[in-house]
């Protein structure tokens, strides 16, 4: 939401909890308003957890409420969207496109029509699972542990004063 606003987009959010100072949205509505908000959405971004309330939430009826040419980004959970209904909306051109890194069945089966749709981008949900990443993480950890013991600067250090008190670090030499 913060990035979308930085790009000049109007951000309309839906969530159970009320607006808090600093929330990066122009409007925030309760989930009960979702259906009436969808006709205003050029992009529908789903970043919700999978719960009894969200499973199958975005069905054919709600997809039809999106404007012609809308796009979907789902980085939440695959089962939130009725995948068959989304595929139909993508094939018919009602949806201009979808960016997905989660699916009803994971990993996405090889026979899924999503692989062949030209208006769909697919990426892994957990890019940290890339080949060789575990080895790089272990090497970085060991190097940083050695640097920490020598009171030298760490690679990729995240400075968070809230967590610092839990893990006091000797001052740099």
Name each model feature, range by range.
Residues 41, 46-49, 75-76, 102, ...:
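Glycine-rich, N-terminal phosphate-binding loop of Rossmann-like dinucleotide-binding domains
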Residues 75-121:
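Rossmann-fold NAD(P)-binding glycine/threonine-rich loop
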Residues 5, 10, 74-80:
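Short, conserved structural micro-motifs that define repeat-unit consensus positions
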Residues 52-54, 80-81, 107, 129:
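Short glycine-rich, flexible loops that bind phosphorylated cofactors or substrates
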Residues 41, 90, 141, 145:
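Hydrophobic "lid"/C-terminal helical patch
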Residues 1-67:
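Rossmann-like dinucleotide/phosphate-binding beta-alpha-beta segment
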Residues 70:
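Glycine-centered, small-residue-biased loops immediately flanking beta-strands
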Residues 106-173:
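C-terminal helix-to-coil terminal segments
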């Amino acid at each position: 939401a913060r990035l979308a606003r930085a790009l000049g987009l109007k951000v309309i959010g839906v969530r159970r909890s009320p607006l808090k100072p600093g929330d990066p949205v122009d409007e925030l509505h309760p989930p009960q308003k979702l259906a009436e908000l969808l006709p205003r959405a050029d992009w529908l971004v789903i970043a919700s957890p999978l719960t009894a309330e969200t499973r199958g939430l975005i069905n054919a009826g709600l997809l039809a409420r999106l404007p012609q040419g809308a796009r979907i980004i789902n980085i939440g959970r695959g089962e939130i969207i009725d995948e068959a209904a989304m595929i139909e909306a993508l094939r018919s051109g009602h949806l201009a496109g979808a960016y997905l890194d989660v699916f009803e069945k994971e990993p996405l089966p090889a026979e899924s029509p999503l692989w062949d749709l030209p208006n769909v981008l697919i990426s892994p949900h957990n890019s940290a699972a890339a080949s060789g990443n575990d080895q790089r993480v272990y090497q970085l950890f060991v190097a940083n542990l050695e640097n920490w013991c020598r009171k030298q600067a760490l690679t990729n250090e995240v400075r968070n004063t809230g967590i610092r008190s839990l893990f006091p670090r000797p001052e740099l030499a």
